């Protein structure tokens, strides 16, 4: 098979503090990793050749911004594999250090590829088999990470990381997700949230299930944090909530966070933080425009509907997915995002943005909103006239 190199277009970023570099892997595909640190440099938009996806070229935009944090703990990976004919993209949001993220950037991809039998499992369309393979891959990587942290990490290394992974093959995408990053999709301008937040607080069904699971494992929730400590309930690493739970309890007593009497009543029946992912299959029908993966440094400061609308507006203006990605990160910074921000946008290349009528995607929504408003006003007038 002739290996095609993606076309690289460079655009200079004058505001965002980030760094990224591409490199070719042994299979002739493309690998993208951001570098750590607070830098100003060029960013790269990748037009993956159609042979990688079997449909139309995917145009990738990405940025990873340190923002106002003292350290950069996020990471992103994009791999377009010409041999195995699928694309892989991942956003990692680290915490308590970056060592877990650095381990995951290579190991998770390799484990996923192995579990998917170098992509051949994707050909069969057996979602149950694909789901099982990806779950095993995540859990295997977590076990290896915990061993690595114990063998090579500092004794005080309590780092961990969320992960939101997207695999695209032909006209279908698979999302594997743990943590509080998020993936959303634009379908003719209508937003679809593809993932749930794995957080031990909130009133959503996912949050309630996470709280229940943590408590059944013997944990407890204080102010939306497991054991008063961590605000995500699924993540890689976080060794103190897995293989070193008893050490965590002892440390808490030594630091005066809880008493020995309290600890004596604790009986762990499982891990409070787990790396078992949610797996979703997403058909990429002709009306799917783009998919966004991003860390919570974006979503905590912008509604997903606003994010999709903003990206569409940007693409209508100039059609450049990389500039749209960088501009989106800047908006989050302008809204005082205090976290690292990492964003990947996969424009599926199906939309002629310059020919797309402005606000076309909002017509139905606006009509519904207008009808609702008129209805509420009418009811209000009726009630006022009859109650007065």
UniProtKB/Swiss-Prot annotation:
SMART domains attached here?
A: PP2Cc
Keyword Membrane applies: yes
For this protein, what reaction is catalysed?
Answer: O-phospho-L-seryl-[protein] + H2O = L-seryl-[protein] + phosphate; O-phospho-L-threonyl-[protein] + H2O = L-threonyl-[protein] + phosphate
Q: What keyword terms does UniProt attach to this protein?
A: Chloroplast, Hydrolase, Magnesium, Manganese, Membrane, Metal-binding, Plastid, Protein phosphatase, Transmembrane, Transmembrane helix
- Keyword Manganese applies: yes
Cofactor dependence: Mg(2+); Mn(2+)
Cellular component aspect of the GO annotation: chloroplast; chloroplast stroma; cytoplasm; membrane; nucleolus; nucleus; thylakoid
Q: How is the cofactor bound?
A: Binds 2 magnesium or manganese ions per subunit.
Q: Where are the transmembrane segments?
A: 363-383
Q: Which domain of life is it from?
A: Eukaryota
> What EC designation does it have?
3.1.3.16
Record-level Gene Ontology MF annotations? magnesium ion binding; manganese ion binding; phosphatase activity; protein serine/threonine phosphatase activity
Q: Which major enzyme category is it?
A: hydrolase
| Positions bound to Mn(2+) 2 | 93, 296, 339
Gene3D superfamilies noted in UniProt: PPM-type phosphatase domain (3.60.40.10)
Q: Which residues bind Mn(2+) 1?
A: 93-94
Q: What family does the Swiss-Prot or TrEMBL record give for this protein?
A: Belongs to the PP2C family.
Q: What is this protein called?
A: Protein phosphatase 2C 57
Give the species.
Arabidopsis thaliana (Mouse-ear cress)
List the lineage, top down: Eukaryota, Viridiplantae, Streptophyta, Embryophyta, Tracheophyta
Gene of this entry: PPH1
């Amino acid at each position: 098979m002739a290996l095609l190199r993606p076309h690289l277009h460079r655009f200079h970023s004058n505001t965002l503090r980030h760094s990224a570099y591409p490199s070719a892997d042994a299979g002739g595909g493309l690998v993208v990793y951001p570098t750590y640190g607070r830098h100003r440099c060029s960013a790269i938009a990748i037009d993956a050749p159609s042979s990688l996806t079997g449909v139309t070229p995917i145009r990738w935009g990405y940025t990873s911004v340190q923002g106002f944090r003292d350290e950069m703990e996020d990471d992103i990976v994009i791999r377009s594999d010409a041999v195995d004919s699928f694309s892989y993209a991942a956003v990692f949001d680290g915490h308590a250090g970056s060592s877990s993220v650095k381990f995951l950037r290579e190991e998770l991809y390799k484990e996923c590829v192995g579990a998917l039998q170098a992509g051949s499992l994707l050909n069969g369309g057996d979602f149950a088999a694909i789901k099982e393979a990806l779950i095993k891959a995540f859990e295997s990587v977590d076990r290896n990470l915990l061993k690595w942290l114990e063998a090579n990490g500092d004794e005080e290394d309590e780092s961990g990381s969320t992960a939101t992974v997207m695999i695209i093959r032909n006209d279908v995408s698979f999302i594997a997700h743990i943590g509080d990053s998020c993936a959303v999709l634009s379908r003719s301008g209508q937003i679809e949230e593809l993932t749930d937040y794995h957080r031990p607080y909130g009133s959503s069904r996912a949050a309630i299930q996470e709280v229940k699971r943590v408590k059944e494992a013997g944990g407890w929730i204080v102010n939306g944090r497991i054991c008063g400590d961590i605000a995500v309930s699924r993540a890689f690493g976080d060794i103190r909530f897995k293989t070193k739970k008893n050490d965590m309890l002892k440390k808490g007593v030594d630091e005066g966070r809880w008493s020995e009497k309290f600890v004596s009543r604790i009986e762990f029946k499982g891990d409070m933080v787990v790396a078992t992912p949610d797996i979703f299959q997403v058909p990429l029908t002709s009306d799917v425009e783009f998919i966004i993966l991003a860390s919570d440094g974006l979503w905590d400061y912008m509604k997903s509907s606003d994010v999709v609308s903003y990206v569409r507006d940007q693409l209508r203006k100039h059609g450049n997915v990389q500039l749209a990605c960088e501009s989106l990160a800047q908006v989050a910074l302008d809204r005082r995002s205090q976290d690292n921000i990492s964003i990947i946008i996969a424009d599926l290349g199906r939309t002629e943005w310059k020919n797309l009528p402005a606000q076309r995607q909002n017509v139905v929504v606006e009509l519904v909103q207008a009808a609702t408003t008129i209805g509420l006003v009418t009811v209000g007038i009726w009630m006022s006239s009859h109650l007065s």
